[in-house]
């Protein structure tokens, strides 16, 4: 069996997605998600110019060798563009291998470690009361875990808060980056009030998560983590910029609130010190951006040695292809923690038919050979790419800040 051709499919059913399709000389094909939010076409160019030509004629079942060929052989290693391209190839090759074996992907990985995969949903609101209403809706739909994000008085735009009740939050909503204004003091004063209100209304059984989105300094994050301990958060996510790994050691010294990080990571080496020093509790690197199943398996294995669990990034800017593969991975991985879930728009699901199911706050993995997600290329052609950029943040004095 040889790789006969490979090509990218760029489509925007609800938002932009990049899909890599690899076809063998025997007619079996696999698909992988190559979407990098706001930088989609950079990955397309990397795949088309540097990766696809090197794949033709190779044995698609030699997944490990191809991974190292693309990683080591490129010399210019790591980075989100390179690793998203490798991740897409790897995902597609595992899809092919599982189809050839006639097995769902999780069986090739080692079989089930659990019967279902717990997910967390996103509850947002312009104020605390509106956020509580969204939490209630999620609870009614069966969610056992909910991320809460609410508007802050005096700040016009808050990360994670949808523009209207019931809408999906989509930050990449302008052709060029919108500029938001941030005030740390107002946020720190308001956030604990949100968690107190959630606990007062919903009690202690609901898993409550929150995303700071890299906005704080280490000592500010330590203060917040300490202050919210009475509310027993499932995790506090991305409380400081992820580049400063040692800062998590400082935060850990001050609080027992569980810490999660990693959605911007694209390599095992980004997380190595965090895991080995036990500065975090959950690693969030997604399959697409972190080099695919082959590399994330190594990351999860390392994490498991130090009692760090997975909590993969899973917003709507990763396509159902990545989500489907992640559900298979979650079903297998021993040190699973939780899976992020933002439902895609109906039109997205039409373009990407899949066999995974959401039920009672959990995903149930499908039994279709492969990762269980396909792409309808005819429908995909109806939704052309449109440039969309993530925002930037400034402090009130104009200083550029972390978004």
Curated annotation (Swiss-Prot):
Feature type site, description Important for activity and substrate specificity: 315
EC code: 4.2.1.-, 4.2.1.39, 4.2.1.8
Cofactor, free-text remark: Binds 1 Mg(2+) ion per subunit.
Catalytic residue list: 159 (proton donor/acceptor), 213 (proton donor/acceptor)
The organism's place on the tree of life at top rank: Bacteria
Cofactor requirements of the protein: Mg(2+)
Catalytic activity: D-mannonate = 2-dehydro-3-deoxy-D-gluconate + H2O; D-gluconate = 2-dehydro-3-deoxy-D-gluconate + H2O
Keyword Magnesium attached: yes
A GO MF label: mannonate dehydratase activity
Biological role: Has low dehydratase activity with D-mannonate and D-gluconate, suggesting that these are not physiological substrates and that it has no significant role in the in vivo degradation of these compounds. Has no detectable activity with a panel of 70 other acid sugars (in vitro).
Protein name in the entry: D-galactonate dehydratase family member RspA
Biological source species: Halomonas elongata (strain ATCC 33173 / DSM 2581 / NBRC 15536 / NCIMB 2198 / 1H9)
